[in-house]
């Protein structure tokens, strides 16, 4: 036990890279270009920060600039609305589908959280892991560095009971501190993606969540499961590999957020096939479904991008092997789907924040917002891959990443 405590202490110490502690003095960050997260572009501008908040954005480069980012592009801290921060490979390099000790699991989660933060993601939403609450609170207290975390803690699916039992589970999740309710309305893509929850169950879970003032995010691949979830009053649909024009339009008409995952998760599974194969439904049939899903996703994202008023938010479904590659989702939505680069950035900033009901706190660079800033090497409006080249990360007024050679501190 003492050895484990020493390991934990050492790990946290190593993770705690030197940061600029959020203080009361004014910090000024200047760059050639600033994208504010709402569609506006500012040239030769400075973000002024005091404590954890942005106090103003000024034109020009003041003499007393604290961080000169030169030709970097500043964007708001990126947001991933669907990341499995606790998923990891075990010591043998295989997917750890059975949890280890609590100490081991929190260390893996902390490592993934740190990796995600270094990739420019300052807020993520985790759809349910046993230690999510501890991780969320530890990061919030500054025990170790990581993105701001929202979590569903657990999930609700077709095995969660009767309508009344499901309503009770929703109330319990609220009591336990869940930020969102995660629902499985369909099977996995590896099992064909058909609807699994009944309409009655979906009406119960989304109805109770709405009554409790809680958000819902729904795993739904098939058109039937998407339609049933939207009609039940759910707020956000995940995946949607088999989404048709009709259900895409339904989501747009009902103001439901859509989080298609086309650039990270399936690619990661196929890249790491040997690490997953033979575990549960990670078998030959399952991988065949996922290979087919790549083409289906391309067709789907093209339709989604061209659906008027559809609110697409940025989520990756990042699992073991994918942490730190979250921005690839932004790149592939532009490449495969034809999404405009500015729209893709908005989906990962202000719109993602709105989907979390945090639109007045994060996702936008403006006075009064949390000082979450990311510096990118290049201009993502002309080269979307710039979102994968992160040289500067500030979260809540603290600098966690500052790459020498691309910018300088004064």
Predicted ranges, named:
Residues 211, 282, 293-380:
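His/Asp/Glu-enriched, well-ordered alpha-helical/loop segment
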Residues 159, 184, 190-295, 318-320, ...:
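Active-site core of metal-dependent hydrolases
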Residues 34, 38-75:
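Histidine-rich, glycine-flanked metal-binding segment
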């Amino acid at each position: 036990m003492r050895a484990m405590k020493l390991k934990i202490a050492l790990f946290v110490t190593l993770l705690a890279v030197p940061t600029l502690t959020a203080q009361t003095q004014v910090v000024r960050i200047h760059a050639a270009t600033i994208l504010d997260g709402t569609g506006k572009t500012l040239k030769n501008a400075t973000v002024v920060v005091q404590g954890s908040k942005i106090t103003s954005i000024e034109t020009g480069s003041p003499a007393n600039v604290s961080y000169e980012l030169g030709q970097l592009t500043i964007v708001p801290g990126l947001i991933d609305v669907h990341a499995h921060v606790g998923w990891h490979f075990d010591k043998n390099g295989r997917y750890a589908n059975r949890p280890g000790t609590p100490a081991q699991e929190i260390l893996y989660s902390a490592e993934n959280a740190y990796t995600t933060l270094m990739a420019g993601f300052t807020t993520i939403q985790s759809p349910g892991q046993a230690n999510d609450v501890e991780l969320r609170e530890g990061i919030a207290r500054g025990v170790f560095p990581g993105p701001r975390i929202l979590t569903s803690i657990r999930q609700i699916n077709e095995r969660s009971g009767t309508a009344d039992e499901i309503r009770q589970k929703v109330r319990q999740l609220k009591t336990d501190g869940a930020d969102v309710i995660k629902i499985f309305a369909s099977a996995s893509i590896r099992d064909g993606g058909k609807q699994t929850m009944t309409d009655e169950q979906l009406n119960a879970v989304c109805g109770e969540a709405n009554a409790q003032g809680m958000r819902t995010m729904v795993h739904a691949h098939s058109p039937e499961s998407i339609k049933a979830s939207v009609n039940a009053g759910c707020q956000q649909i995940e995946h949607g590999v088999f989404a048709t024009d009709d259900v895409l339009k339904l989501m747009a008409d009902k103001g439901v957020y859509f989080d298609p995952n086309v650039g990270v998760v399936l690619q990661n599974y196929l890249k790491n096939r040997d690490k997953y194969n033979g575990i549960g439904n990670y078998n030959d049939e399952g991988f065949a479904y996922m290979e087919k899903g790549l083409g289906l996703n391309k067709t789907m994202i093209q339709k989604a991008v061209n659906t008027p008023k559809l609110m697409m938010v940025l989520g990756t479904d990042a699992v073991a092997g994918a942490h730190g590659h979250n921005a690839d989702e932004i790149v592939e939505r532009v490449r495969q789907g034809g999404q405009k680069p500015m729209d893709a950035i908005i989906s990962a900033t202000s719109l993602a924040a709105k989907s979390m009901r945090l639109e007045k706190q994060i996702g936008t660079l403006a006075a009064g917002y949390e000082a979450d800033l990311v510096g990118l090497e290049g201009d993502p409006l002309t080269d979307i891959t710039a979102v994968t080249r992160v040289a500067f990360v500030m979260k809540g007024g603290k600098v966690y990443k500052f790459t020498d050679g691309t910018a300088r501190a004064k």
